[in-house]
């Protein structure tokens, strides 16, 4: 391109990037602190791109000229930054004082929630085997494996604790991004904090806020159905962001962190389809990689720069159709930790509406459960894709948590569903599998590949009666928040499943410590309460 025009600084500019450029340069907050390469750039417009012939913009208080002619845009004083640079700048420039009260409150809520869920999974399927296997990967006592009393190298702790947070489908979720942002982020951040003393509660809260922003910005950018497992892939970038913030890395170093993390990014939907225990392990692999990526960048290893949007970048290869502009425009304005939802029930989020509807049916009981002929869920393609799998007579827990028929049958039996219903003889209960035959799912006409709502539950009786319930917003989502009482009840219940028993006093002290996290001088105080 340089030979064609006589210009040296030339880059292809798609419709999407043209639009994103204009969105960025009109964002005054962004321009106050531009993480840009200040030079003249000459950007080729690819076929179909359009732009006004002339605009006068103000960049950092100085007028800047932008011309479009003969299929080229001439940008003076400002060039379109890579998304990795924008995200890295957000990480390094955010201070605890920048966080609104709501972001701090929700960061505390989901830190406590994630600790509880992680502790409970110390007795879940696969946890013991993973801990045993990890003993062959090197020795060290950097960090705690939650709920066990065992100490291991920091990278191993990040892997195992991330597995434990996600392996029971009880961890918090960002519905719009279709990912579980804390599952990778908190274990990596806590492992780093244990390895390096002096990480304060304020540091942790800030790291959580920016880490969730990074993973969810990537998640909401996707306009395609899941193929790679986003809680692991995008979640890994969020974990890397959080650790980089705690490590005090520079903007340039964090750009490298993203590139190095991408080189290690892994996780597909195949284990989800099969109900394999490897599904949550993928979350762990990326949490471990986050620590390694930050260590490598801190040691001076440079990574690729155009990690997300490049010709072989993450979004292009792993997400298909995408648009980063809306998410990037929200950085520093709308904190995504405040958009995270609780999991009130231990199942895939796509099954939580079914559970709520069945519990409501049980409380109203318009006709006896013994008279139910069928129970149909009609909803967006995503919930069918995630939970419309056939029941099996002896499923493992990972399969059962993502099987609407199994989930629904358990709720009909017990008017609730808990962690215990995915363990031992509960998985092979013949009555459960008989009731599972009542359930089916049907796709509606929703065109959004990432939508979970609305969906409808229709229960029909043998005599022709019909009961309907429609879910417009998931229980415990931002518009239907879980009460503090229910939040703490969930945490206390989770602690009761710990492999190493926790006394009630320690549980209550941990609640208080997280409530007062901004006053904690070293977050290892939280770990001390878990041992």
Tell me the role of every PLM-derived stretch.
Residues 3-10, 14-19, 25-26, 34-38, ...:
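A cross-taxon signal for low-complexity, glycine/charged-rich
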Residues 75-178, 278-288, 295-531:
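Terminal-appendage/accessory-domain detector
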Residues 150-169, 203-218, 253-265, 316-317:
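Short, charged, amphipathic alpha-helices and their helix-cap/turn boundaries
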Residues 168-218:
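Hydrophobic alpha-helical hairpins/lids featuring a short glycine-rich hinge
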Residues 177-183, 203-208, 224-236, 279-285, ...:
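Active-site nucleophile and cofactor-binding loops and adjacent substrate-binding regions
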Residues 185-187, 191, 230-246, 256-326:
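Amphipathic alpha-helical interface segments
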């Amino acid at each position: 391109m340089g030979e064609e025009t006589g210009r040296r600084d030339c880059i292809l500019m798609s419709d999407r990037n043209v639009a994103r450029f204009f969105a960025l340069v009109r964002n005054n907050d962004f321009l106050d602190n531009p993480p840009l390469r200040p030079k003249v750039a000459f950007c080729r417009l690819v076929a179909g791109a359009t732009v006004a012939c002339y605009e006068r913009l103000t960049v950092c208080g100085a007028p800047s000229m932008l011309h479009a002619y003969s299929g080229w845009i001439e940008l003076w004083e400002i060039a379109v930054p890579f998304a990795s640079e924008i995200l890295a700048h957000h990480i390094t420039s955010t201070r605890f004082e920048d966080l609104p009260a709501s972001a701090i409150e929700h960061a505390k809520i989901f830190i406590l929630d994630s600790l509880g869920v992680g502790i409970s999974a110390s007795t879940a399927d696969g946890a013991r085997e993973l801990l045993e296997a990890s003993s062959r990967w090197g020795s060290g006592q950097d960090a705690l494996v939650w709920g066990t009393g065992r100490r291991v190298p920091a990278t191993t702790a990040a892997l195992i604790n991330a597995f434990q947070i996600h392996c029971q489908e009880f961890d918090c979720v960002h519905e719009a991004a279709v990912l579980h942002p804390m599952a990778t982020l908190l274990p990596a951040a806590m492992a780093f904090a244990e390895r390096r003393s002096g990480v304060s509660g304020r540091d942790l809260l800030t790291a959580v806020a920016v880490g969730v922003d990074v993973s969810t910005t990537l998640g909401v950018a996707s306009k395609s159905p899941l193929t790679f497992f986003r809680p692991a892939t995008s979640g890994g970038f969020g974990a890397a962001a959080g650790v980089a913030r705690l490590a005090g890395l520079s903007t340039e170093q964090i750009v490298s962190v993203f590139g190095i993390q991408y080189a290690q990014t892994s996780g597909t939907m195949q284990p989800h389809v099969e109900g394999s225990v490897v599904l949550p392990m993928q979350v762990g692999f990326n949490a471990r990689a986050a620590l390694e990526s930050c260590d490598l960048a801190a040691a001076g290893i440079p990574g690729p720069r155009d990690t997300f949007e490049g010709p072989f970048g993450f979004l292009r290869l792993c997400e298909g159709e995408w648009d980063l502009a809306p998410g990037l425009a929200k950085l520093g304005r709308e904190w995504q930790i405040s958009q995270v939802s609780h999991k009130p029930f231990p199942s895939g989020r796509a099954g939580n509406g079914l559970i709520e509807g069945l519990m409501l049916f049980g409380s109203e009981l318009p006709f006896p459960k013994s008279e139910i002929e069928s129970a149909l869920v009609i909803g967006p393609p995503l919930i069918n894709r995630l939970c419309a799998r056939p029941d099996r007579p002896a499923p493992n827990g990972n399969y059962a948590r993502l099987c609407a028929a199994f989930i629904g049958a358990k709720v009909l039996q017990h008017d609730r569903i808990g962690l215990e219903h995915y363990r031992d003889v509960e998985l092979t209960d013949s009555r459960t599998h008989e009731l599972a035959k009542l359930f089916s799912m049907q796709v509606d006409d929703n065109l959004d590949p990432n939508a979970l709502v609305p969906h409808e539950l229709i229960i029909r009786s043998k005599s022709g009666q019909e009961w309907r319930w429609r879910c417009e917003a998931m229980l415990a989502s931002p518009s239907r928040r879980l009460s503090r009482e229910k939040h703490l009840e969930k945490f206390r219940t989770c602690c009761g499943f710990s492999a190493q028993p926790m006394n009630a006093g320690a549980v209550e002290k941990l609640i208080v410590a997280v409530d007062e996290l901004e006053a904690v001088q070293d977050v290892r105080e939280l770990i001390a309460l878990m041992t």
